[in-house]
Amino acid sequence: MKFAPILLASAASAHTIFSSLEVNGVNHGVGGGVRVPSYNGPIENVDSASIACNGAPNPTTPTSKVITVQAGQNVTAIWRYMLSTTGSAPNDIMDISHKGPTMAYLKKVNDATTDSGVGGGWFKIQEDGYNNGVWGTEKVINGQGRHSIKIPSCIAPGQYLLRAEMLALHGAGNYPGAQFYMECAQLNIVGGTGSKTPSTVAFPGAYSGSHPGVKISIYWPPVTNYQIPGPSVFTC
């Protein structure tokens, strides 16, 4: 695959940001309840505290807004290349070379505006890997940057952090190389039954640099089966 190095070089700066959250058809605006960074670069060290909700080298901006969401409904994370990007064409989202899975996690917290997200309590509620030759990131890139996430109906009500993530594997043949893009939204989830308690993981800790879903060549040999990193998806 002689073209791969050229492809990687040309796409090296094609990053992305989870910039806003849409609930019930209402977009809460860039940085409205989402801790957006000042730079759109990735986190590559899975052992960094920044793997939780982003951070150094991408300082995030605090927000006092907490978005109320009904348990059981779908919300939409909106991804854009930069905070100032207004379009929704594929190039406005992330370079198409950035192929990999999408994921989403929740963490129950006492105060969504102050909890750093670092540490335990996280459970996965969505993932989309490699299916029928199409990556989860491709669906978001070609779908106007829309990343649909269902909030479980059976969790306890209260404040949560929602961690939406896209993982780009174009340079993941060695570790570090995989590019993790994530931000955290601040939610107040209402109407949950609290009938099930999810098993949880920690960030950092949920991912390993040696995991086959983190260290993988997606160019050669051709990918036939992909193992998404992290825990299984929590279901009610």
UniProtKB/Swiss-Prot annotation:
<keyword id="KW-0119">Carbohydrate metabolism</keyword>
<comment type="similarity">
    <text>Belongs to the polysaccharide monooxygenase AA9 family.</text>
</comment>
<dbReference type="InterPro" id="IPR005103">
    <property type="entry name" value="AA9_LPMO"/>
</dbReference>
<dbReference type="GO" id="GO:0030245">
    <property type="term" value="P:cellulose catabolic process"/>
</dbReference>
<keyword id="KW-0964">Secreted</keyword>
<feature type="binding site">
    <location>
        <position position="15"/>
    </location>
    <ligand>
        <name>Cu(2+)</name>
    </ligand>
</feature>
<keyword id="KW-0624">Polysaccharide degradation</keyword>
<feature type="disulfide bond">
    <location>
        <begin position="154"/>
        <end position="236"/>
    </location>
</feature>
<keyword id="KW-1015">Disulfide bond</keyword>
<keyword id="KW-0732">Signal</keyword>
<comment type="function">
    <text>Lytic polysaccharide monooxygenase (LPMO) that depolymerizes crystalline and amorphous polysaccharides via the oxidation of scissile alpha- or beta-(1-4)-glycosidic bonds, yielding C1 or C4 oxidation products. Catalysis by LPMOs requires the reduction of the active-site copper from Cu(II) to Cu(I) by a reducing agent and H(2)O(2) or O(2) as a cosubstrate.</text>
</comment>
<feature type="binding site">
    <location>
        <position position="170"/>
    </location>
    <ligand>
        <name>O2</name>
    </ligand>
</feature>
<feature type="binding site">
    <location>
        <position position="98"/>
    </location>
    <ligand>
        <name>Cu(2+)</name>
    </ligand>
</feature>
<dbReference type="GO" id="GO:0004497">
    <property type="term" value="F:monooxygenase activity"/>
</dbReference>
<keyword id="KW-0136">Cellulose degradation</keyword>
<keyword id="KW-0325">Glycoprotein</keyword>
<feature type="binding site">
    <location>
        <position position="179"/>
    </location>
    <ligand>
        <name>O2</name>
    </ligand>
</feature>
<feature type="binding site">
    <location>
        <position position="181"/>
    </location>
    <ligand>
        <name>Cu(2+)</name>
    </ligand>
</feature>
<keyword id="KW-0560">Oxidoreductase</keyword>
<dbReference type="InterPro" id="IPR049892">
    <property type="entry name" value="AA9"/>
</dbReference>
<keyword id="KW-0186">Copper</keyword>
<dbReference type="Pfam" id="PF03443">
    <property type="entry name" value="AA9"/>
</dbReference>
<keyword id="KW-0503">Monooxygenase</keyword>
<keyword id="KW-0479">Metal-binding</keyword>
<feature type="glycosylation site" description="N-linked (GlcNAc...) asparagine">
    <location>
        <position position="74"/>
    </location>
</feature>
<dbReference type="GO" id="GO:0005576">
    <property type="term" value="C:extracellular region"/>
</dbReference>
<dbReference type="GO" id="GO:0046872">
    <property type="term" value="F:metal ion binding"/>
</dbReference>
<protein>
    <recommendedName>
        <fullName>AA9 family lytic polysaccharide monooxygenase G</fullName>
        <ecNumber>1.14.99.56</ecNumber>
    </recommendedName>
</protein>
<feature type="signal peptide">
    <location>
        <begin position="1"/>
        <end position="14"/>
    </location>
</feature>
